[in-house]
Amino acid sequence: MIEQSLSKPSFSLSIPIPKAPKSKSSFFCSYSKIRCESVDYPSLTKIDAKHPQNSTTINNGSSSSASVDLKNNEKGPYPYPGGGKMGPYTGRDLNEKKPEWLRQRAPQGERFEEVKESISRLNLNTVCQEAQCPNIGECWNGGGDGIATATIMVLGDTCTRGCRFCAVKTSRTPPPPDPMEPLNTALAIASWGVDYIVITSVDRDDLSDGGSGHFAQTVRAMKELKPEIMVECLTSDFRGDLKAVDTLVHSGLDVFAHNVETVKRLQRIVRDPRAGYEQSLSVLKHAKVSKKGMITKTSIMLGLGETDDEVKEAMTDLRAIDVDILTFGQYLQPTPLHLTVKEYVSPEKFAYWKEYGESIGFRYVASGPLVRSSYRAGELFVKTMVKESAKEAAAIS
């Protein structure tokens, strides 16, 4: 964004930077201006925020300007929810209260504690914990089918990207992958006695193949120890590297999942700049055509300010590349530093999206306020779909 600052409109922030004091009795600071491009809101051309906690001044390019007291005006005249206290699009929006249907009891239960202890003892990472999934209690306790499930996260617990909805910790230089992780993960999962498992990972832009080789080793190790197990892989976009997609698709997995996350218009706001709508569609399309019978899956968060027409456009684009499974869930803000919730979508609206999705050709749609990418991924319908697709592919070949 800094490289693009010569284009207009733009805004500048005056940031206090500590300066070496001339005496021990006083504190000095100087101000440095950072110019950033205003992509979505051309009317927002300049912000001078010398005291971000107290007030800011907006100049709309005319001779007059407006001074806003953020302490008394949480939203301010900003074209995004949450005001300007924590930066663009962030901070708590006090006008939005979490509805009852999103309130969850704290995870508890004997089975939950057993799974938690097992994961800790085996030194495994789970997206359930790292991403603060609201369904962790239901899934680890067995849910409706009585089978405790967890989504295992490989390639470490530190992501190289900084998507503005995600609670997973980030770093430009995370630790190198554990070479024993594929085997240890396979041994642990084989001991659980489950017949469907979801493997996901952080983004690893620091690795030449984006981590696809390590991911594939994990799948092959699981299939070798337990051939009948069904494996779903929820992957990164591998920076759009289709050879990396091939590596994983041909590792023996049964479901290839990659999330577009949100509608096209909101991509640059919600996701890391290295991700993109067209890039994600390309990855999903290639996974489908790369191997006969491959089931593809994606997920969209609602409540970020998308419109119905934009959601339908995304669904149409996904059906055009023959995505089989789609999930919808409510975006929940993990911390005040993350994106604010624009809207709490009602359960009735989620039911509408499920019905609409199935009417336009998706083979399975999971849609609900607390649904997440891997929510009840291995339920009977999906497992039956995997078996049928495998038989069809074998018959064709």
From Swiss-Prot:
SMART domains: Elp3. Its cofactor is [4Fe-4S] cluster. Residues 49-85 are annotated as: Disordered. GO terms for cellular component: chloroplast; mitochondrion. The keyword Transcription does not apply. GO terms for molecular function: 4 iron, 4 sulfur cluster binding; lipoate synthase activity; metal ion binding. Its main location: plastid. Residues 1-35 form a transit peptide. Binds 2 [4Fe-4S] clusters per subunit. One cluster is coordinated with 3 cysteines and an exchangeable S-adenosyl-L-methionine. Pathway: Protein modification; protein lipoylation via endogenous pathway; protein N(6)-(lipoyl)lysine from octanoyl-[acyl-carrier-protein]: step 2/2. It catalyses: [[Fe-S] cluster scaffold protein carrying a second [4Fe-4S](2+) cluster] + N(6)-octanoyl-L-lysyl-[protein] + 2 oxidized [2Fe-2S]-[ferredoxin] + 2 S-adenosyl-L-methionine + 4 H(+) = [[Fe-S] cluster scaffold protein] + N(6)-[(R)-dihydrolipoyl]-L-lysyl-[protein] + 4 Fe(3+) + 2 hydrogen sulfide + 2 5'-deoxyadenosine + 2 L-methionine + 2 reduced [2Fe-2S]-[ferredoxin]. Residues 54-67 have a biased composition (Low complexity). InterPro entries: Aldolase_TIM, Elp3/MiaA/NifB-like_rSAM, LIAS_N, Lipoyl_synth, Lipoyl_synth_chlpt, rSAM. It is an enzyme of class 2 (transferase). It is found in: Plastid, Chloroplast. Residues 142-363 form the Radical SAM core domain. Its EC number is 2.8.1.8. [4Fe-4S] cluster 1 binds at residues 128, 133, 139, 374. Keywords: 4Fe-4S, Chloroplast, Iron, Iron-sulfur, Metal-binding, Plastid, S-adenosyl-L-methionine, Transferase, Transit peptide. Belongs to the radical SAM superfamily. Lipoyl synthase family. This is Lipoyl synthase 2, chloroplastic. The gene is LIP1P-2.
